[in-house]
Amino acid sequence: PDSDYDVRFLYVHPLEWYLRVESPRDVIELPIDDELDVSGWEWRKALGLLKGANPTLIEWLDSPVVYQQDEETITALKAMVPTWFSPLRARWHYYSMAQKNFRGYLQGDEVRLKKYFYVLRPLLAVRWVEAGKGVPPMRFSELLAGSELDAALRAEIDELLERKQRAGEAEYGPRRPLLHAFIHAELARGEIPPVLPD
């Protein structure tokens, strides 16, 4: 389900938690409702994920919306991102996300228009990584601005963005052939990955 607010956080436990013999649960997830989607990772888990070049954590750190944070801690964590970022893993992550979202959301003759962005964003992120630009920006507007696209395709995306802002998140409409053609081409192209550094 979709929610109005996605809340992501990192947390620490009291010292006793870290001295346990067994490995306790290191994730907090609350049931999703219409307003909130809340989940967080324990600090040590987050550091391990960063070391493993986890793109999801890297996106969390680049979120344009921050409700609360410890500036010094987050600044230090962000400074580690270039050290651990893996173009190969990021490309695979975004390509897989685009495939999954396309199959899950854009197969009917009528589709929920905002779901196009669930596919376009990871596909543009794949292009960003393949171009050697480093970590893809979280903001779709920055990702779009840094992408070289056919003028007609860019106009179609811009029009869809305007329509989404006017009509809201839930609007349905007929599938868009130009966008579908681009998505199909990018997914087919992505099956043969380029050589990227690990």
Pin down the residues of each PLM region.
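An N-terminal structural lobe/cap that precedes and organizes the functional/catalytic core
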Residues: 1-69
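Short, mixed-charge, low-aromatic patches
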Residues: 2-6, 74-80
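General structural signal for secondary-structure boundaries
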Residues: 14, 42, 69-72, 86, ...
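Short amphipathic alpha-helical patches
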Residues: 29-31, 42, 69-74, 104-105, ...
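Short secondary-structure capping/junction motifs at helix and strand boundaries
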Residues: 53-78, 85-94
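Conserved nucleotidyltransferase catalytic core and NTase-mimicking acidic/glycine-rich helix/loop elements
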Residues: 76-197
